[in-house]
Regions:
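Acidic/aromatic-lined carbohydrate-recognition and catalytic surfaces
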Residues: 2-7, 12-179
Length: 179
């Protein structure tokens, strides 16, 4: 009997090298609503640390944390204004170091959600692009000349309205934002 297409595919799948995460259970946490350790109404990094034993009991191996970086929170924290800073509402870098240390003690991994598709309009690069749209940082974004009544495309923003907005400080320019 000859090998079918499905048999070949199954054989290839079984022959694939297994990676460390293939047999792990991951649990995504939106920190703001997970566990509030200090009673301010906002979940935080110490709250995640306090619940590591509970998560381990559930069989969780990987804790995937949604963005905790500095943000104006126009997009639930996915509009990051500083990738190097933890937003104070979630804690400090020391809190993050403590979480990592405690997770390691439990043979757990921490996976950070890294949003590289877009940033906040308060991010340093966007602010520099607004200062000089034809400069280095202007090339990091889709910035086009603005013609009254015309848009480069008819795409809609995820939150409604066109994806094109006037570039702050430059009425003759427009920038594209999907969110």
């Amino acid at each position: 009997m000859s090998e079918t297409k499905i048999d070949k595919k199954i054989r290839r799948i079984h022959a694939m090298e297994r990676k460390w995460w293939h047999n792990k259970v991951a649990y995504q946490i939106y920190p703001k609503s997970f566990y509030d350790s200090n009673g301010d109404g906002i979940g935080d990094l110490p709250g995640i640390t306090l619940k590591l034993d509970y998560l381990k009991e559930l069989g969780v191996d990987i804790v995937w944390i949604s963005p905790i970086y500095s943000s104006p929170f126009a997009d639930q924290g996915y509009d990051i204004s500083d990738y190097y800073q933890i937003d104070p509402c979630f804690g400090t870098m020391d809190d993050m170091d403590h979480l990592l240390k405690e997770a390691k003690k439990r043979d757990m991994y921490i996976l950070m959600d890294l949003v590289v598709n877009h940033c906040s309009d308060e991010h340093e690069w966007f602010e520099k692009a607004c200062e000089d749209p034809d400069g280095e940082y202007g090339n990091f974004f889709y910035i086009e000349d603005r013609k009254e009544g015309e848009l480069p495309c008819n795409w809609r923003s995820y939150f409604g309205g066109p994806v094109w907005e006037p570039l702050p400080g430059h009425p003759d320019k427009q920038y594209m934002h999907v969110f």
